[in-house]
């Protein structure tokens, strides 16, 4: 069974954080060719800090999927990295989180679950459940066109 749970940045073990950041490099730099900060085969940035929580999907001890959460009133990608791309957009300061660095490792997922296990959909539901369980009003995120298509299919 796929276990999905949340951890604070400070709770990540060295082994788990190395796996997380290596899979993020594989996804965002190697596969999607994004301009991201990479070092020692890992992708991480200034938003991976003590203000951050992660939702992790683990199966048989292997990390399959993850997303990063930061409360919207704290420094995050929307208000800091991408703010120049938007005109004067007023975002709520409290009650919302920003999600970023969503990924599902396709290779591991196919190897462990085959082609017919809806990991992305299950993970989207887990993100919504996390938000509701922790009292957030909603989630803000910036997505690529491909991710927008996946989100629309999810409902």
Positions of the model-derived regions?
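Short, His- and charge-rich active-site/binding loops that engage polyanionic ligands
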Residues: 60-90
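A short helix-loop-beta-strand connector motif used in the catalytic cores of GNAT acetyltransferases and
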Residues: 45-56, 74
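Short amphipathic alpha-helix that is part of the acyltransferase structural core
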Residues: 1-43, 54-56, 63
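Short connector loops at helix/strand junctions that flank enzyme active sites
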Residues: 50-52, 64, 92-97
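Beta-rich nucleic-acid/ligand-interaction surfaces
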Residues: 42-46, 147-149
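Short loop/turn segments at secondary-structure transitions that flank enzyme active sites
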Residues: 26, 73-75, 105
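Acyl-donor binding region in acyl/amide transferases
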Residues: 82-155
């Amino acid at each position: 069974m796929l276990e999905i749970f949340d951890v604070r940045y400070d709770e990540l073990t060295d082994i788990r954080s190395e796996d997380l950041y290596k899979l993020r490099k594989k996804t965002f730099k190697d596969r999607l060719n994004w301009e991201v900060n990479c070092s020692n085969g890992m992708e991480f940035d200034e938003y991976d800090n003590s203000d951050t929580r992660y939702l992790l999907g683990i199966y048989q001890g292997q990390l399959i999927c993850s997303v990063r959460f930061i409360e919207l009133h704290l420094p995050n990608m929307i208000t800091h990295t991408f703010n120049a791309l938007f005109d004067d957009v007023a975002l709520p300061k409290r009650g919302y989180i920003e999600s970023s660095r969503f990924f599902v490792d396709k290779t591991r997922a196919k190897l462990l679950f085959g082609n017919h296990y809806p990991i992305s959909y299950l993970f989207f539901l887990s993100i919504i459940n996390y938000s509701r369980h922790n009292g957030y009003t909603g989630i803000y995120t910036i997505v690529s066109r491909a991710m927008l298509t996946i989100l629309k299919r999810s409902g």
